[in-house]
């Protein structure tokens, strides 16, 4: 008795994309059944898959046909990849994205919008609809125009405040400077940095009356800097302008005949403080217009007492 008669007879089993023939008809039916599996793809998908006919559970039979996955076969036809390829192709043919269209307002529309903005910066949704209907525009166009106009108005307002003050926003490490005004008015700012440098930012036009003199305690040059550690002192003490300038006057000895039209270049405050001045009419020190630098020792008011004039 042959081996084919001893084994039980059962038909071929189809499970999805797999074709599992019987052992007896493996040689003869493989060539005929393999094309039939390609034609009846929809019937094979509806046929339930039996677990006892899987290749792992059966020791007899041979795998006849295997349809590869789309991820492993470049020629596989998967319907889910077609729309993506089509989108990429369409995007490649069109090139870059289209720019957003800008609304071209007429002169009458712009005039009406500006007049309304001058009287009312914020509009309610109902007012926006009414204005859009009156101008022949859409709700979004009017709303966007008012938003852009408010941003421009705030930016211009902030810049005008900076120009009026003559300063910009303070950065880290800088303190706001204060100065005194005397008749005639003279404005001079002293930005004080953290390393105790005091730089004098002088103006190009300085107006002093001819009756002002230095050293008498009344017509002193006014300057004062706001700092946490005090004015020209490291011990936390403070002094007024008359005491500071009285000390300068005693060290420099120019009480009489000194011109008041002085161009101050810089005033630096560190461990040793220097005072620089230039003048074209100095007769007491030199006969030619040169630059003089005077070094004056500064002392803390807590230890020095007799410098006030």
Swiss-Prot record:
UniProt feature, compositional bias: Low complexity: 25-41
Entry keyword annotation includes Amino-acid biosynthesis: no
DNA-binding region: 98-157
Compartment annotation: Nucleus
Family recorded in the similarity comment: Belongs to the Nanog homeobox family.
Organism per entry: Gallus gallus (Chicken)
Pfam families assigned: Homeodomain (PF00046)
Keywords: DNA-binding, Homeobox, Nucleus, Transcription, Transcription regulation
PROSITE patterns, per the entry: HOMEOBOX_1, HOMEOBOX_2
CDD domains from the UniProt entry: homeodomain
Gene Ontology biological-process entries: cell differentiation; positive regulation of stem cell population maintenance; regulation of transcription by RNA polymerase II; stem cell population maintenance
Gene Ontology, cellular component aspect: nucleus
Function: Transcription factor required for the maintenance of pluripotency and self-renewal of embryonic stem cells.
Expression induction: Strongly down-regulated during embryonic stem cell differentiation, induced either by retinoic acid treatment, or by cell adhesion prevention leading to embryoid body formation.
Renumbered residue ranges of the record's region Disordered: 24-104
Biased composition regions of type Polar residues, renumbered to the chain: 55-75
Name of the protein in its database record: Homeobox protein NANOG
A Gene Ontology molecular function term of the record: RNA polymerase II cis-regulatory region sequence-specific DNA binding
Biased composition (Basic and acidic residues): 87-96
Matching InterPro entries: Distal-less_Homeobox_TF, HD, Homeobox_CS, Homeodomain-like_sf
Gene3D superfamilies in the record: Homeodomain-like (1.10.10.60)
SUPFAM superfamilies, alphabetized: Homeodomain-like
